């Protein structure tokens, strides 16, 4: 890490350096290479899941709760995941959140049982979802014939 001096504005005020910035819902970290933090995404995912599970709880069937998880909570967790580089630890921390929700739905303490239930109910793992979203993003980006994209590709 570099220890840089603060930037001084024309009116003499000092701008300090930040370790992260939140832009369009993505937290970008101060690092040597582009990386994102998923702490806020996980918190929003847990908040959404707990709100839904608190309302329907054990009244609704597992099918309904899994469908709500897939349609309402997972998009929160996966927001802009296609543009953020994912490390193995990022994938495992996001998968842990989903597995924890499935464990709560099926009232189990076993990750293996939760993963099997998720698979049987059609909840794909984070790695697969991220790859699908990234491929779709790149195909959509490639399909658009924009000057900016052609310029970026030529660099």
Question: Which positions does each model-derived feature cover?
Answer:
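Non-catalytic, peripheral interaction segments enriched in hydrophobic/basic residues
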Residues: 1, 21-137
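C-terminal helix/juxtamembrane-tail motif
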Residues: 140-155
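Short, conserved micro-motifs composed of acidic
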Residues: 1-19
């Amino acid at each position: 890490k570099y220890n840089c001096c603060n930037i001084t504005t024309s009116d003499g005020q000092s701008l300090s350096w930040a370790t992260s910035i939140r832009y369009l819902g993505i937290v970008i970290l101060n690092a040597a290479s582009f990386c994102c933090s998923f702490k806020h995404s996980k918190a929003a995912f847990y908040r959404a899941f707990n709100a839904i599970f608190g309302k329907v709880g054990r009244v609704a069937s597992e099918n309904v709760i899994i469908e709500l998880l897939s349609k309402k909570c997972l998009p929160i967790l996966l927001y802009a995941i296609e543009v953020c580089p994912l490390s193995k630890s990022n994938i495992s921390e996001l998968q842990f959140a989903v597995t924890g929700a499935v464990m709560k739905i099926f009232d189990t303490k076993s990750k293996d049982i939760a993963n099997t239930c998720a698979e049987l109910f059609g909840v794909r793992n984070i790695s697969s979802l991220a790859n699908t979203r990234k491929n779709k993003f790149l195909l959509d980006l490639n399909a658009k014939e924009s000057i900016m994209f052609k310029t970026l590709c030529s660099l």
